Amino acid sequence: MEDERLVPVSPRHAVLLSREYLTFVDTPPQRDYVVRTVAKRQVGAMMLMSGDLVIASADTRKSFPLAERYPLHFRKSYFPGQMHGETKDEFDNHARASTLIDIPPPIGHTPNTFRSCLLPGRPYSRLSPFFGVDPPTANIAEAEKLPLASAAGLWKLCEEAFSKLVTLQEGGLAHGDAELHNFIVCPTPLELILIDFEGSVSREAQTAEAWKKRCALDLEPLLREAVYLQCALGKQRGRFAELALERMPLLLKQPEQFHRAIELRGSVSG
């Protein structure tokens, strides 16, 4: 047996696995083999939710055809005591999103589990120099320190994220939790992928007013990031940039400080 091998984890992604894990890929274990726990929610010693990278068992592969194709994948498990939405709804909304914005499809679900493709990348929030900075006005100084190449790259990623969110909404689906950690930046191929559709809602299930509000809320994290990045780059063109400046008074306190920083950066750049 080879020491290492590329194993597909989605229609366009693969990861290099060592022999230790290839054994379970080639010979399905009796139970899902947990490679790593990447997220968990608990109260004291009581586990409520666990998000794990797993190698699918024989039964899992029989139950879900995509688990046979992508045995290494992400499994979210809910335990008694954890309130959660219907996993079938999450599966259906994820599948709908995959057709609207070309993301890897979901793998499967049971009443207490949800499975999706492993995405080899990092959350956008970990790439942003502005994430977690408080107060928000401190991001003006962070923006001034940001190299042009970094600011330009982050801007292009955010434009891509904005385009995908808008396409999703125009297709009748609102994400419901479009925080920056739910945008995964994958390097090979370089792309940004939206994850976690547990809180997604369809337009037909909302009143017109509720739908409008939900869509606006989904855009807020990206629009704030757009303001911060324009403090580094100066005023940009296009719907994304314009909407961020238009809604700035609703997004940030002391919007005049950000306006001034953007104008000054533009004059320096020019």
What are these regions (language model features)?
Residues M1-K40, A45-L48, P249-G270:
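Regulatory N- and C-terminal appendages and interdomain linkers associated
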Residues D92-D102:
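Structural motif at the C-terminus of the N-lobe alphaC helix and the adjacent alphaC-beta4 loop
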Residues D102-L157:
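Conserved structural core of kinase catalytic domains
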